[in-house]
Curated annotation (Swiss-Prot):
Domain UVR: 208-243
Task performed by this protein: The UvrABC repair system catalyzes the recognition and processing of DNA lesions. UvrC both incises the 5' and 3' sides of the lesion. The N-terminal half is responsible for the 3' incision and the C-terminal half is responsible for the 5' incision.
Protein name per its UniProtKB record: UvrABC system protein C
Keyword presence, Amino-acid biosynthesis: no
Subcellular location as annotated: Cytoplasm
Domain of life: Bacteria
One term of GO molecular function: excinuclease ABC activity
CDD domains named among the record's database cross-references: GIY-YIG_UvrC_Cho (cd10434)
Main subcellular location of this protein, as a coarse class: cytoplasm
Length: 676
């Protein structure tokens, strides 16, 4: 472990200006990013007295081998640079947000001729309007199901829409009036777009106007003695009011705000955010924050600063990736940064943080602490949610941690390992009668799956042409995995090309293969060949769940039988089953690609884009096979020569054209390539 005195900057060499600093480990990986009003004052605090540092900070300083900094002009610039570096390097010692899954939003695809309503996760796209986020996808579907009674907008995929257009018959939603069925021309594109825009206006908070319009239409229908239409409009108004009841008014002045609250202990903090738009709670999100232990960083003010920086920085990136076009312009309901952000306390750099948030929003943002009235009442509700979330997380973690500790201890004791197997890797082979032979490698750390480290392999040497050798396949995968580890260990400079870690730099404590004695011995032979002696190898056989160890082991030649109620056996089963699942998933994907390979793949000069255009135009390869050359050339980018080559590849006999016809076809094909 590096000695901090070996990389401490010389006295007086650190500038006193504001800036951002990075600590790197011996391999050049960035392990911590921070900012400071005075770089000299902050960095000197890390080296003055190690015993006075928080345990996590002391570990960071002892792990690091280098510190570097960048001077900036203002604290706002420091805030932005710190955020960018944390996003780029994901330093292990910075505050991390766990359980920050991709929350679903309701997307309205206004960039399509017939806009669609759908549940969506991922980066924002141009011309699409977003509402949310919602805590669950079912909440979006429930909202859409309720509102499509009044706003019968399209919710189907492009494939379903095209199929019903071709058969000229609407889907079930069209028959029950929950879709206006633009696929069969029941409404025009302009009429359908207006339905969708009214839907967007309702979700954006423009509810009073829509309800008044419906009430006016209901009254007019009743006066015209059209009681059936009046009754339908009455039911529509009731549906809208039920939807509004689900979004209780919390701010009578119609404020747009995010309300942020924390609940914390010495190690972690729970964060809860309520999104209020138009005075109504439109969404809620929550995280568990691991506190870093950095001096002054674990206080509530620092938690507020760190959270707002990361949360709104991410939201602004999503928003800029999908700047809405034309009639889908961003409004108060969809702007990632609201007019007000209510927090439990103001951080020390509240002015700089407010300026940065205002820049993200494009107009003034107020950062406030609620003191009284509706805002104070809602803040207390959010805070209760945060306390409940932290309590539930600690209860769940305590149970999980106890079980995982018992499982790792059981495996250590059973196998006679010097240490608990904190990192377990498992490989499994999957194939069907020797075809598409693949392998998976899954990783568990501290008894939990680490999916970012998962790998899959296509078997190259030990299988192929209908033959398969599971033992040789195990040996091949083991060699490829540990050869990579040895290479990374012997060439550490290659790890820091971008300052980011390469996961295979870390070997497992326990290597598990799916199988019995032959598979275990094959894996152990590879490790012996590579000179690796600090990795334990076992096999887990499905029959009786026997644990096999390599031949010559001190544990004897017979398999080990763990008790059925053993936590250790349960963990090994989970690891083995996860490897099996991951291998089958990859095998099915590879087999599917092979089985769906089209005869069109062999047509020279016909790329993926034009192949897709052909199949889309005709609906299937079978219909394409029945088409004539003239019909095929109607597809943009397809000339006569290519059309004949397509039919030839599909086994359709072609009459030999006359020389003049051939020349004309070539010229025509060339012209199409140029103009297309």
């Amino acid at each position: 472990m590096p000695d901090p005195s070996t990389y401490r900057p010389a006295p007086g060499s650190i500038p006193v200006e504001p800036g951002v600093y990075r600590f790197r480990d011996p391999h050049g990986r960035v392990i911590y990013v921070g900012k400071a009003k005075s770089l000299r004052s902050r960095l000197n605090s890390y080296f003055a007295d190690l015993s006075g540092l928080a345990p996590r900070t002391r570990q960071m300083v002892m792990t690091a081998a280098k510190v570097e900094w960048t001077v900036v002009n203002t604290e706002v610039e420091a805030l932005q640079l710190e955020y960018n570096w944390i996003k780029e390097f994901d330093p292990r010692f910075n505050i991390r947000y766990r359980d920050d899954k991709s929350y679903p939003v309701l997307a309205v695809t206004l960039n399509e001729e017939f806009p669609r309503l759908k549940v969506y996760r991922g980066p924002r796209k141009k011309g699409v309007r977003y509402f949310g986020p919602y805590s669950h996808a079912w909440a979006i579907r429930e909202t859409v199901d309720l509102l499509t009674r009044v706003f019968p907008a399209r919710t189907c995929s492009a494939g379903v829409f095209k199929r019903h257009n071709q058969i000229d018959r609407p889907c079930l939603l069209g028959y029950i009036d929950k879709c206006s069925a633009p696929c069969v021309g029941r409404v025009s594109a302009e009429q359908h777009r207006q339905i969708v825009l009214d839907f967007c206006d309702f979700l954006a908070g423009k509810t009073d106007r829509l309800v008044r319009d419906l009430e006016r239409k209901m009254t007019a229908a009743a006066e015209d003695l059209d009681f059936e239409r009046a009754a339908r409009l009455r039911d529509d108004i009731g549906a809208l009011r039920r939807a509004l009841e689900k979004q209780t008014v919390v701010f009578g002045d119609g404020t747009d705000a995010d309300v942020v609250a924390f609940a914390d202990d010495d190690l972690e903090a729970a964060v809860q955010v309520f999104h209020v738009r138009g005075g109504r709670v439109r969404g809620q999100r929550g995280w568990i924050v691991e506190k870093s232990g950095e001096p002054g960083e674990s206080g509530e003010g620092q938690l507020v600063e760190q959270f707002l920086t990361q949360f709104y920085g991410d939201q602004a990136e999503l928003g800029s990736a999908g700047d809405n076009a034309g009639d889908s312009g961003q409004d108060e309901a969809t702007n990632p940064v609201p007019r007000q952000v209510l927090v439990p306390c103001l951080p020390d750099n509240a002015d700089e943080l407010t300026e940065w948030l205002s820049q993200l929003r494009g107009s003034r943002v107020a950062l406030r602490v609620p003191q009284r009235g509706d805002k104070k009442a809602l803040f207390e509700t959010v805070q209760r949610n945060a306390k409940e979330a932290l309590a539930q997380h600690k209860l769940k973690r305590a149970g999980d941690f106890t079980a995982r500790t018992a499982a790792l201890q059981s495996i250590q004791d059973t196998l006679g390992l010097a240490d608990a197997p904190l990192r377990i890797e498992c490989i499994d082979i999957s194939h069907v009668q020797g075809t598409d032979v693949v392998a998976s490698l899954v990783v568990f750390e501290d008894g939990l799956p680490r999916k970012s480290d998962y790998r899959h392999y296509a078997i190259r040497e030990a299988a192929g042409d209908g033959r398969s050798d599971d033992v040789a396949s195990i040996a091949e995968v083991t060699r490829r995995r540990f050869y990579r580890h040895l290479h990374d260990t012997q060439h550490p400079t290659e790890l820091s090309a971008e300052g980011k870690s390469r996961k295979f730099a870390y070997p497992p404590n326990l290597f598990v293969v799916d199988g019995g004695a032959p598979q275990v011995n094959a894996a152990q032979a590879v490790l012996d060949e590579l000179g690796i002696s600090d990795v334990a190898v076992i096999g887990l056989a499905k029959r009786l769940e026997e644990v096999w160890v390599p031949s010559g082991s001190d544990l004897g030649p017979e398999p080990i039988i763990l008790p059925r109620n053993s936590e250790g056996l349960y963990l090994l089963q989970r690891v083995r089953d996860e490897a099996h699942r991951f291998a089958i998933t990859y095998h099915r994907s590879k087999r599917s690609k092979r089985m769906t390979a089209s005869a069109l793949d062999s047509v020279r000069g016909l790329g993926e884009h034009r192949r897709k255009a052909l199949v889309t135009h005709f609906g299937s390869v079978a219909r394409l096979k029945e088409a004539s050359v003239e019909e095929i050339t109607a597809v943009p980018g397809i000339g006569v020569t290519t059309a004949r080559a397509v039919l030839e590849a599909l086994g359709v006999p072609q009459a030999a054209p006359a020389d003049s016809d051939t020349a004309a076809a070539v010229i025509d094909d060339d012209q199409r390539r140029v103009t297309g």
